Swiss-Prot record:
Keywords: Cytoplasm, Endosome, Host-virus interaction, Membrane, Neurodegeneration, Parkinson disease, Parkinsonism, Phosphoprotein, Protein transport, Transport. This is Vacuolar protein sorting-associated protein 35. One of its GO terms (molecular function) is D1 dopamine receptor binding. Ubiquitous. Highly expressed in heart, brain, placenta, skeletal muscle, spleen, thymus, testis, ovary, small intestine, kidney and colon. Signal peptide: none annotated. One of its GO terms (cellular component) is mitochondrion-derived vesicle. Acts as a component of the retromer cargo-selective complex (CSC). The CSC is believed to be the core functional component of retromer or respective retromer complex variants acting to prevent missorting of selected transmembrane cargo proteins into the lysosomal degradation pathway. The recruitment of the CSC to the endosomal membrane involves RAB7A and SNX3. (Microbial infection) The heterotrimeric retromer cargo-selective complex (CSC) mediates the exit of human papillomavirus from the early endosome and the delivery to the Golgi apparatus. Pfam families: Vps35 (PF03635). GO terms for biological process: endocytic recycling; intracellular protein transport; lysosome organization; mitochondrial fragmentation involved in apoptotic process; mitochondrion to lysosome vesicle-mediated transport; modulation of chemical synaptic transmission; negative regulation of gene expression; negative regulation of inflammatory response. InterPro entries: ARM-type_fold, Vps35, Vps35_C. Changing residue 469 to P: Found in a consanguineous family with intellectual disability; uncertain significance. It comes from the Eukaryota.
């Protein structure tokens, strides 16, 4: 029967299991011999156990498990030997003896174990033995076996390396220099073994070998950790000996994986103070690394670490004599120059880190931030980059770069000091420019940054011009209406931040803003011009407040209303009618309230313009009713007109109301007009209400007549009730023309018509309205002590 082939994983498990079983058997025998003080037999079993490490069949992961199991057993031997030597057994003999072990792997592991015990028992032999051991390990040149052997050497000697502050005879016991040499040599040899791993085996297994190398990297990196733990390694020794030795090995090995890992290792394991003193050599080495090394990540890791160090509240900060930004700026430029094939997004990533460094370490140096932006512009020019696509990696990095100053300063005026911010902004394509413009304006709004001069307005408008005017590179199809409205609303809100303490300066600001917004096209100006008009009206009120200190305030107000008129006219040209109508009405109100020279003429002109728009541009019946109601309501509030101007305007309102297309609309509008003849005011009566009772009655009678002409019974009754409420209003305002008899007749008419209506939800609402009206009259009739006329003779 054929045997099924095992998977590589199953095979590994089987091989490892067999090796572990052999280790257990040999370690049991070793311990048994040690318990009986049979040292030579114990060493023989230890050698057999260590023989398992000679295998080439195990993967690094499996080999590591085997190595750990054997290391634990060797610890038992080490403890035993330490006790024996303490009792007086000769170590030197044993050290000589284990060198005769048959195979090199068991021999060297035993030598290290005995050697460490020897040093602990006789410290004066330390220098020679350490040198001896690190040299002897060269005997194993198989990458995997050699790496683990040297790792064992490093682990065992951890606590016996000479360091600062030890009272010793340096001639024989060694000093900190010997420790540095020992670890550096071990590191160099381990790195060579690690690099050599890639050349073993078949080329088709390259990816697998790379994965295995990744798994083993920590063994090499441990050497650097050990160096960083030596107290005797101060800044000077680090600069002169340690870093020089490490970088020499890193650069010379010409292996991308090793170089990238070890450079990152250096950054992580050594203190910030050391990095600050060795920036130039470290960054120079970065420029010499293999082309496949992602240098960007290495430099960014160092920059980010030092930026954090500088930002730490409890830290000493960056020493004044170290020009951190300048060093990084120059060295990063060198690295970019040395790597012509570096991806554009990586180049920008480096600039992102530089700008972060400038912001955190030198928050007051706007020039440093601008220097980074300038460098980026120069790089883009060299690369001939134009209109970077939104979806590209470069665009994402450039967005990060430009958002940093916006988010850090939270003040657009500081951002505008960066001369190269706008030129860099222009490298984006349409979508990215639009999105960044929204981001900038949102920041201005979030932090309520006031824009106080014409130049600032110009600069910001030019920066976010994608939101304000059509662009040559914008898509042909129309934008999504909701998104467009959101973007333009941002711009509209931004207008309210154009505020100068000086009213004259404010006028210039509004003029500048209008130049930009005026070129925005019909779709945009409906969002952007109305806030500008309101800002103009507010400015006119400010001039009124300053009238005592500014003798030209009236002329300035006329100028402002002329500005508003022109701005509203632009909206009319864009074929918008309701919006400019409302703005004209608002302007008429403002002119009337402010009361400057010629204000009546201005207010009349604005009212006339509103009427013209109503008559010429608004055709929808619903919109017409809303518009005439607005005109009547606005006019009723105004008291700046003489009778000469007031009379034609109120007559015009009544005429327009009676010409509405639908009868119900006519009825409602005409009854609303009644208020103009009662509470309307003009200058001939010193601002007192007209109280033209007769004209009020004419309007209400006309409204009733129109209601009678309605074909829909329920609509007719509804109008009667609404007109009844108007009659009641004027009766309570003591209009003599409205009598109890008139009220009784109308109530009687409604009572007769109501039962004839078909049962429906609408009828229910009409009944409720009528009931509430009668309830009001009942309460007034039963409370004669309340103010207002008495309802005597009212039939309910």
């Amino acid at each position: 029967m054929p045997t099924t082939q095992q998977s590589p994983q199953d095979e590994q498990e089987k091989l490892l299991d067999e090796a572990i079983q052999a280790v257990k058997v040999q370690s049991f025998q070793m311990k048994r011999c040690l318990d009986k003080n049979k040292l030579m037999d114990a060493l023989k079993h230890a050698s057999n156990m260590l023989g398992e490490l000679r295998t080439s069949m195990l993967s690094p992961k499996s080999y590591y498990e085997l190595y750990m199991a054997i290391s634990d057993e060797l610890h038992y031997l080490e403890v035993y030997l330490t006790d024996e030597f303490a009792k007086g057994r000769k170590v030197a003999d044993l050290y000589e003896l284990v060198q005769y072990a048959g195979n090199i792997i068991p021999r060297l592991y035993l030598l290290i174990t005995v050697g460490v015990v020897y040093v602990k028992s006789f410290p004066q032999s330390r220098k020679d033995i350490l040198k001896d051991l690190v040299e002897m390990c060269r005997g194993v040149q198989h990458p995997l076996r050699g790496l683990f052997l040297r790792n064992y050497l490093l682990q065992c000697t951890r606590n016996i390396l000479p360091d600062e502050g030890e009272p010793t005879d340096e001639e024989t016991t060694g000093d900190i220099s010997d420790s540095m040499d020992f670890v550096l040599l071990n590191f160099a040899e381990m790195n060579k073994l690690w690099v050599r791993m890639q050349h073993q085996g078949h080329s088709r297994d390259r990816e697998k070998r790379e994965r295995e190398r990744q798994e083993l990297r920590i063994l090499v990196g441990t050497n650097l950790v050990r160096l960083s733990q030596l107290e005797g390694v101060n800044v000077e020794r680090y600069k002169q000996i340690v870093l020089t030795g490490i970088l020499e090995q890193v650069v010379n090995c010409r292996d991308a994986l090793a170089q990238e890992y070890l450079m990152e290792c250096i950054i992580q394991v050594f203190p910030d103070e050391f990095h600050l003193q060795t920036l130039n050599p470290f960054l120079r080495a970065c420029a010499e690394l293999h082309q496949n090394v992602n240098v960007k990540n290495i430099i960014i890791a160092l920059i980010d670490r030092l930026a954090l160090f500088a930002h730490r509240e409890d830290g000493p900060g960056i020493p004044a004599d170290i020009k951190l930004f300048d060093i990084f700026s120059q060295q990063v430029a060198t690295v970019i120059q040395s790597r012509q094939d570096m991806p554009s997004e990586d180049v920008v990533s480096l600039q992102v880190s530089l700008i972060n460094l400038a912001m955190k370490c030198y928050p007051d140096r706007v020039d440093y931030v601008d220097k980074v932006l300038e460098t980026t512009v120069e790089i883009f020019n060299k690369l001939n980059l134009e209109h970077i696509a939104t979806s590209s990696a470069v665009s994402k990095e450039l967005t990060r770069l430009l958002k940093i100053p916006v988010d850090t300063y939270n003040n657009i005026l500081t951002v505008l000091k960066l001369k190269h911010f706008h030129p860099l902004f222009e490298y984006f394509d349409y979508e990215s420019r639009k999105s960044m413009s929204c981001y900038v304006l949102s920041n201005v709004l979030d932090y309520n940054t006031e824009i106080v001069s014409q130049d600032q307005v110009d600069s910001i408008m030019n920066l976010v011009s994608t939101l304000i005017q059509d662009q040559p590179d914008q898509p042909v199809e129309d934008p999504d209406p909701e998104d467009f409205a959101d973007e333009q609303s941002l711009v509209g809100r931004f207008i309210h931040l154009l505020r100068s303490e000086d009213p004259d300066q404010q006028y210039l600001i509004l003029n500048t803003a209008r130049k930009h917004f005026g070129a925005g096209g019909n779709q945009r100006i409906r969002f952007t011009l109305p806030p500008l008009v309101f800002a103009a009206y507010q400015l006119a009120f400010r001039y009124k407040e300053n009238s005592k200190v500014d003798d030209k305030w009236e002329k300035k107000c006329q100028k402002i209303f002329s500005f508003a008129h022109q701005t509203i006219s632009a909206l009319i040209k864009a074929e918008l009618a309701e919006l400019p109508l409302r703005l004209f009405l608002q302007g008429a109100l403002a002119a009337g309230e402010i009361g400057f020279e010629n204000h009546e003429t201005v207010a009349y002109e604005f009212m006339s313009q509103a009427f013209s728009l109503y008559e010429d541009e608004i055709s929808d019946s619903k919109a017409q009713l809303a518009a005439i109601t607005l005109i009547i309501g606005t006019f009723e509030r105004m008291k700046c007109f003489s009778e000469e101007n007031h009379e034609p305007l109120r007559t015009q309102c009544a005429l327009a109301a009676s010409k509405l297309l639908k009868k119900p609309d006519q009825g409602r509008a005409v009854s609303t007009c009644a208020h103009l003849f009662w509470s309307g005011r003009n200058t001939d009566k010193n601002g007192e209400e007209l109280h033209g009772g007769k004209r009020v009655m004419e309007c209400l009678k006309k409204a009733l007549k129109i209601a009678n002409q309605c074909m829909d019974p329920s609509l007719q009754v509804q109008l009667f009730i609404e007109i009844l409420n108007r009659y009641i209003y004027f009766y309570e305002k003591e209009n003599d023309a409205v009598t109890i008899q008139v009220l009784n007749q109308l109530i009687q008419k409604i009572r007769e018509d109501l039962p004839n209506l078909e049962s429906s939800e609408e009828t229910e609402q009409i009944n409720k309205h009528f009931h509430n009206t009668l309830e009001h009259l009942r309460l007034r009739r039963e409370s004669p002590e309340s103010e207002g006329p008495i309802y005597e003779g009212l039939i309910l």
